């Protein structure tokens, strides 16, 4: 399974996975890079850019016209100029890595004819305008802002569109479901349509006061009749002699309860007796028998509603309006008969006017409810004008409406593209939900849309259709960097637009250029604000490569326009079936953010609409193909998807008849026939994130512990010597490559030169004549990460090695041979040990400390600035007043510490003096001044010193000078060193270029007839290599041959060579010029020095360690090697863990890892013995056989030559690395087989002896190798002590916390403890002289200095604060110091 790569041949992982992976895992930081590239579109494609990203922003804001339409500013195109500084320079100088944006604008000035108002073009001017800097993304998907690396986290938010929901019966006490619809645009006003408890439908705009929904429809231009005809069908009741004839429709009459007999209108027969219910089946049978119409009496029309206005055709008088209810009054003296009224008009009066039929609304109160009709009758607005005024009053209370303003306001709410944008996503979602067919370029609402929303909502109330699930991933989408940035830039441009309009109207438009109208500050400020202070722009977590990659793949539901922690309920945080393969169900923080911050699954990607997609293999007629299709959550709902571990035969057919699938909209797990399966997962690990996919035996761990395991891997500190895990999952190489920690070769080539800081590769493929044939890779040496861990890269190649494109040529922090290596493999015994591993404590062997197994390097950065103060400039110097020569021993003549110096707390790093204010002189000073002239010293020492708790070695010093300030010797030395480095790069590249070009030239000229040449060359002699060697290479160009084609080729080559040479020199000069130029420093700063101190942290009691299965603990004791438990062969355990940590936590994965790790080490030992034997006998056959036993027929091992095989054997002798992918890993039988292969007992347990007594323990102990990590919670960063230090201003008590160099809080409970012991004097000290008795603590200090131990406590300052507080409340409290020795009265004692 191992790829044939340069590092893959040096270490081969035995692969336990059974499932062939069809899909390539996408690049892990693609989310970031693709999104931002799409936003910027740096290279303009031929035919112009598409309307998206930055282009779309400019297109939406421009053209800008002035208020009188006499001129117009149009956008033509934009381009980026190259950035001023590259990424490294920005990191060092504390600048933002950004490119200047240049926009071409066209100003058109019109002539307006005063009579006709027609416009004609008078003048057109085009100009390039600078529009601020746009930050660029680095190769690794981060941004460098003010010198620090930041990541823009993608945001999950509710997709624009329409959503239907109900209140789950919570609003009204009866538990009635109140339905509501909400139209959410990408930007603009929200529209809510909702039912109240009385079944009246209301609309709300932007969560304001509600208005009847019919008012909204009036405002849209409908009248009452149109509203009713939109929502209800019309039925004609015809008047006959006997009564009313009504058409019979089975679906309408089902469930109809009869009061009188139902009579067939044609035959007069009774179809159904009175008092019975017409069932669905009976209704259908009647229709089949040919029942056409029924005869109804007046009383059965009561409760129906009129569908149209009834108008007197002669007079135009309205009898009854649409929506009026039919009522009946009993006729006096007659029980049966009633008189029918329509509204207030008697039916008789209507029939007398010649009306033969009555149009009624089809409302049966069962299938169709009268909600809209009731709303209409409850609505006090009757016309469009009233409705518009009403809406205006809701939106702008307190302003008197005019018809014009009300109309404009309503128009701008939903129908104006400037103010309202559904976005393409919103339109697509809306079309899908409401079965509309508007094009996705139509981004505002239409009348049809609003009516369709109301119709669907009323349908829900009538029991048709389903509500939406807002946690479904089809209803949530991701906004990545590009989109967030686009929104931000649009805000900036809109701010700019206002200023431009005003300026266009105020200046003489004929004389100005576009440049004069534009002030790019608002746009630049919006961008700066977004990158600097947005909640989604985060300081990158750079603890190790995994934490970087995870940070870039994070999805947050928080942030502007998202949720807040407090408001987010359970449902939002929960795992949803649609998360499968899209969002990891495991990796999320513990605590208040749980479920709101998620991680993208390994194979997931974000599509152009912002929905998360996951890949599936297509299944055709029961056969699984290798075609991979990406589906979003909405699309997946229609298909049945099988899991990746379903068994297949050789042809890819399912071996079982019934397959376990996820099917239907709810994604329930069901069994379905093989031929009905549509898709199959591509890989078992597609449902988890990168961090979770790095946990072997994840399937055997409890979810809570797996969550902790994936989160703690991100806190692992890079160790001095990284070691890849014996038991991995096969993801390690992918993470190392994609995170950018390890360096991959850009082109195939041969290693030309190498040292610890750079690798030079001579390319042998992809040779582009316009580019150089040399790749120079600069390695990062001892650089500080954001979390102060150490970034250090080490080469893996030797001179002459051949590498292919994409091969790993250098390891970075936490990588080992191109694989992620967060911790170390250590020998663990699971057993209690004298209580030292109680409650998850960890017992360590001294070997771990001695051999620096868990030692890490941390780099602390300190900076000092020399400012220009009112009293004069500060100065960085070695000449500091009142400081001994001993204290200055590490400083050079410029007052800056040497590189390599060992420093400890309190040492001076950079000497600095600050001018002191003039203080009035005493007579003695005046006398001394008169005698000795110049006063002693008017400066004070403000040097940069090492803070408490830091001790280490200086690894780097950087000096920054303001323009025009003379550089000191140290700054010049650093500059010289840097220039030498650049010159070496240039010379090496030049040498390889010369070698390549002159080599090719010699090949071309060899054995050619020479017609001309340099001085001393005889004409018409043959040119051979020997002839060429006689002349310097620069003169070879003078040789000429009669072959014209050859000469043309040589000429082209020479031109190319000259250009490359010139380009090289130019690049070098540019860099040198940048170096020698002054630095851009904050205002008032003359000079700045940064000092980097490398601190070596060995592991010690109090440090936190963890495995990959959520098994975390704190080191409790470090025991001498000889006291640790040991095995029969004398090997001592490195770590002793408590076995009680496993059962209750249910993370059994760690035990399986222990057994498998034990087998790996055992097999490694065997390989080591075989190699030792080889050195004696020179026979490689046993090694090949041993490897075959372990790996089976591995292609890579077969292809190795003897030298490579020995190197591989040596790499494997510590332990054979294996990969057990998640959900598809080694089974119990595999582990037992490996243990037997290694020569161990299949139980995985060994006899162990006590190191202190040498006795055998009573029973066997589980022993094996676990991959342990040292986490970032180091005791050195937390422990803290103080004797004297800063005090709070008001209470005069010591400050708190390590950062403020504060004291320890002696709180209420601690006081109780001392009171309980009766330690009165100790307590008094704690509350007075050790805290806030100002006079007392000074006296104590003096007494201790004198060696005296008598002191007394005074009044604490907080008592005075209390007195002042009481006075401020108007209580005059005085403190009387009575010195009288009179005892208090006796009753006071009681």
Curated annotation (Swiss-Prot):
Entry's Gene Ontology BP terms: DNA-templated transcription
Top-level taxonomic group: Bacteria
GO molecular function: DNA binding; DNA-directed RNA polymerase activity; ribonucleoside binding
Keyword Transcription assigned: yes
EC number: 2.7.7.6
Record has Zinc as a keyword: no
GO cellular component, one term: DNA-directed RNA polymerase complex
Catalysed reactions, as listed in the record: RNA(n) + a ribonucleoside 5'-triphosphate = RNA(n+1) + diphosphate
Alphabetical list of SUPFAM superfamilies matching this protein: beta and beta-prime subunits of DNA dependent RNA-polymerase
Matches recorded under InterPro entries: DNA-dir_RNA_pol_bsu_ext_1_sf (IPR042107), DNA-dir_RNA_pol_bsu_external_1 (IPR019462), DNA-dir_RNA_pol_su2 (IPR015712), DNA-dir_RNAP_su2_dom (IPR007120), DNA-dir_RNAP_su2_hyb_sf (IPR037033), RNA_pol_bsu_bac (IPR010243), RNA_pol_bsu_CS (IPR007121), RNA_pol_bsu_protrusion (IPR007644)
Keywords recorded for this protein, A-Z: DNA-directed RNA polymerase, Nucleotidyltransferase, Transcription, Transferase
Pfam families: RNA_pol_Rpb2_1, RNA_pol_Rpb2_2, RNA_pol_Rpb2_3, RNA_pol_Rpb2_45, RNA_pol_Rpb2_6, RNA_pol_Rpb2_7
CDD domains reported in the protein's UniProt record: RNA_pol_B_RPB2
NCBIfam families referenced in this protein's UniProt entry, alphabetically: PRK00405.1, rpoB
Biological function: DNA-dependent RNA polymerase catalyzes the transcription of DNA into RNA using the four ribonucleoside triphosphates as substrates.
Family from the record: Belongs to the RNA polymerase beta chain family.
Quaternary assembly: The RNAP catalytic core consists of 2 alpha, 1 beta, 1 beta' and 1 omega subunit. When a sigma factor is associated with the core the holoenzyme is formed, which can initiate transcription.
Record HAMAP family: RNApol_bact_RpoB
Name of the featured protein: DNA-directed RNA polymerase subunit beta
């Amino acid at each position: 399974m191992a790829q044939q790569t340069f590092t893959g041949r040096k270490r081969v992982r035995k692969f336990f996975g059974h499932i062939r992976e069809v899909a390539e895992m996408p690049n892990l930081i693609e989310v970031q890079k693709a999104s931002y590239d799409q936003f910027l579109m740096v290279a303009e494609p031929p035919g112009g850019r598409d309307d998206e990203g930055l282009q779309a922003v400019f297109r939406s804001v421009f053209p800008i016209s002035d208020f009188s339409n006499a001129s117009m500013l149009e956008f033509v195109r934009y381009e980026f100029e190259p950035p001023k500084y590259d990424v490294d320079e920005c990191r060092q100088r504390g600048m933002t890595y950004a490119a200047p944006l240049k926009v071409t604008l066209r100003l058109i000035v019109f002539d307006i004819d005063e009579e006709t108002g027609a416009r004609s073009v008078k003048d057109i001017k085009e100009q390039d305008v600078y529009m601020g800097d746009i930050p660029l993304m680095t190769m690794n998907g981060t941004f460098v802002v003010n010198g620090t690396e930041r990541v823009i986290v993608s945001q999950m938010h509710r997709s624009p569109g329409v959503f239907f929901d109900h209140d789950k019966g919570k609003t009204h006490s009866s538990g009635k479901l109140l339905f509501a619809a909400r139209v959410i645009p990408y930007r603009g006003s929200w529209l809510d349509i909702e039912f109240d408890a009385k079944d009246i439908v209301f609309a709300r705009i932007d969560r304001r006061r509600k208005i009847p929904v019919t008012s909204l429809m009036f405002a849209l231009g409908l009248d009452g009749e149109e509203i009713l005809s939109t929502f209800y069908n019309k039925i004609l009741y015809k008047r006959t002699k006997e009564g009313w004839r009504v058409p019979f429709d089975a679906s309408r009459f089902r469930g109809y309860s009869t009061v009188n007999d139902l009579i067939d209108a044609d035959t007069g027969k009774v179809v159904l007796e009175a008092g019975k219910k017409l069932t669905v089946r009976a209704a259908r049978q009647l229709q089949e028998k040919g029942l056409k119409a029924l005869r109804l009496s007046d009383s059965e029309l009561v409760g129906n509603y009129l569908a149209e206005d009834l108008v007197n055709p002669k007079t135009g008088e309205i009898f009854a309006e649409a929506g009026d209810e039919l009522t009946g009054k009993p006729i006096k003296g007659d029980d049966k008969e009633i008189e029918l009224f329509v509204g207030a008009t008697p039916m008789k009066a209507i029939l007398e006017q010649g009306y033969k039929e009555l149009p009624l609304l089809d409302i049966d109160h069962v299938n169709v409810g009268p909600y809209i009709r009731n709303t209409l009758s409850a609505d006090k607005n009757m016309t469009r004008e009233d409705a518009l005024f009403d809406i205006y009053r809701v939106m702008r209370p307190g302003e008197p409406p005019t018809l014009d303003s009300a109309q404009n306001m309503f128009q701008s709410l939903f129908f104006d593209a400037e103010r309202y944008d559904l976005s393409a996503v919103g339109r697509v979602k809306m079309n899908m939900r409401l079965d509309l067919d508007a094009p996705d370029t139509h981004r505002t609402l239409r009348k049809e849309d609003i009516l369709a929303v109301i119709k669907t909502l009323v349908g829900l109330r009538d029991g048709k259709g389903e509500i939406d699930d807002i946690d479904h991933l089809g209803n949530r989408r991701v906004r990545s960097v590009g989109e967030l940035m686009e929104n931000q830039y649009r805000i900036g441009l809109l701010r700019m637009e206002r200023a431009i309009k005003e300026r266009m109207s105020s200046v003489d438009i004929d004389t100005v250029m576009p440049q004069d109208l534009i002030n790019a500050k608002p746009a630049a400020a919006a961008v700066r604000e977004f990158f600097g202070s947005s909640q989604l722009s985060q300081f990158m977590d750079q603890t190790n490569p995994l934490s970087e990659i995870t940070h870039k793949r994070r999805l947050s539901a928080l942030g502007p326009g998202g949720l807040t922690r407090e408001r987010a309920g359970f449902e939002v945080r929960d795992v949803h079936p649609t998360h499968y393969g899209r969002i990891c169900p495991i990796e999320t923080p513990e605590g208040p953010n749980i479920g709101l911050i998620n991680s993208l699954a390994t194979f997931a990607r974000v599509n152009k609409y912002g929905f998360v997609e996951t890949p599936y293999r297509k299944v055709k007629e029961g056969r699984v193909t290798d075609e991979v299709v990406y589906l979003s959550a909405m699309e997946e709902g229609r298909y049945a998807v099988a899991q990746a571990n379903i068994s297949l035969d050789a042809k890819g057919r399912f071996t079982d008849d019934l397959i376990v699938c996820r099917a239907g909209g709810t994604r329930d797990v069901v069994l379905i026939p093989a031929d009905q399966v549509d898709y199959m997962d591509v890989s078992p690990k597609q449902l988890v994130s990168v961090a979770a996919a790095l946990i072997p035996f994840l399937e055997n761990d409890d979810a809570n512990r797996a969550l902790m395991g994936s989160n703690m891997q991100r806190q692992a500190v890079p160790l001095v010597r990284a070691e890849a895990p014996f038991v991995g999952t096969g993801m390690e190489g992918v993470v190392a490559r994609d995170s950018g920690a390890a360096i991959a070769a850009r082109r195939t080539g041969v290693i030309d030169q190498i040292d610890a800081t750079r690798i030079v590769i001579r390319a042998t493929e992809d040779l582009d004549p316009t580019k150089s044939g040399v790749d120079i890779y600069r390695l990062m040496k001892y650089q500080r990460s954001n979390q102060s861990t150490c970034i250090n890269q080490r080469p893996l190649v030797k001179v002459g090695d051949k590498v292919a494109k994409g091969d790993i040529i250098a390891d970075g922090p936490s990588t080992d041979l191109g694989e992620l290596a967060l911790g170390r493999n250590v020998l663990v015994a699971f057993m209690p040990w004298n209580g030292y591993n109680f409650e998850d404590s960890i017992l360590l062997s001294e070997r771990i400390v001695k051999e620096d197994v868990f030692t890490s390097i941390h780099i602390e950065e300190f900076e000092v600035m020399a400012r220009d103060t009112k009293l004069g400039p500060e100065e960085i110097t070695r000449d500091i007043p009142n400081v001994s020569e001993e204290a200055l021993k590490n400083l050079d003549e410029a007052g800056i510490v040497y590189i390599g110096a060992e420093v400890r707390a309190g040492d001076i790093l950079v000497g600095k003096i600050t001018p002191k204010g003039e203080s009035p002189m005493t007579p003695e000073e005046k006398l001394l001044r008169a005698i000795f002239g110049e006063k002693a010293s008017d400066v004070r020492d403000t040097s940069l010193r090492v803070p408490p708790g830091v001790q280490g070695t200086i690894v780097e010093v950087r000096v920054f000078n303001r323009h025009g300030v003379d550089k000191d010797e140290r700054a010049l030395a650093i500059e010289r060193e840097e220039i030498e480095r650049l010159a070496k790069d240039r010379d090496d590249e030049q040498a390889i270029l010369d070698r390549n070009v002159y080599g090719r030239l010699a090949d071309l000229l060899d054995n050619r007839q020479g017609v001309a040449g340099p001085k001393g060359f005889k004409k018409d002699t043959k040119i051979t290599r020997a002839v060429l060697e006689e002349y310097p290479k620069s003169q070879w160009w003078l040789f000429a041959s009669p072959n014209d084609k050859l000469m043309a080729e040589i000429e082209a080559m020479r031109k190319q060579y000259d250009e490359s040479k010139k380009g090289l020199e130019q690049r070098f000069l540019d860099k040198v010029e940048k170096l020698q130029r002054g630095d851009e420093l904050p205002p008032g700063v003359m000079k700045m020095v940064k000092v980097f101190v490398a601190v070596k942290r060995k592991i010690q009691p109090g440090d936190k360690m963890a495995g990959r299965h959520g098994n975390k603990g704190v080191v409790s004791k470090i025991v001498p090697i000889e006291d640790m438990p040991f095995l029969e062969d004398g090997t001592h355990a490195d770590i002793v863990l408590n076995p009680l940590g496993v059962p209750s936590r249910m993370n059994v994965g760690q035990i399986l890892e222990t057994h498998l790790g034990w087998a790996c080490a055992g097999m490694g030992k065997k390989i080591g013995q075989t190699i030792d034997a080889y050195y004696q006998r020179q026979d490689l056959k046993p090694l090949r056989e041993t490897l075959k036993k372990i790996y089976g027929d591995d292609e890579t091992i077969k292809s190795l030559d003897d030298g490579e095989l020995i190197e591989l054997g040596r790499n494997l002798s510590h332990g054979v690395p294996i990969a057990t992918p998640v959900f598809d890993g080694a089974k119990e039988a595999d582990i037992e087989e490996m243990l037997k292969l290694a020569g161990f007992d299949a139980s995985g347990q060994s006899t162990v002896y006590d190191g202190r007594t040498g006795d055998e323990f009573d029973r066997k102990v589980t022993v094996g190798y676990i991959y342990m990590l040292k986490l970032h919670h180091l005791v050195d960063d937390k422990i803290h002590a103080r004797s004297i230090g800063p005090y709070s201003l008001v209470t005069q008590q010591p400050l708190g916390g390590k950062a403020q160099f504060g004291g320890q809080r002696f709180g209420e409970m601690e006081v109780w403890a001392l009171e309980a012991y009766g330690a009165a004097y100790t307590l008094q000290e704690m509350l007075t002289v050790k805290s806030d008795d100002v006079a007392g603590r000074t006296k104590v200090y003096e007494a201790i200095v004198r060696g005296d131990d008598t002191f007394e406590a005074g009044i604490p300052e907080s008592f005075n604060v209390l007195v002042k507080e009481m006075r401020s409340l108007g209580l005059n409290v005085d403190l009387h110091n009575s010195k009288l020795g009179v005892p208090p009265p006796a009753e006071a004692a009681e």
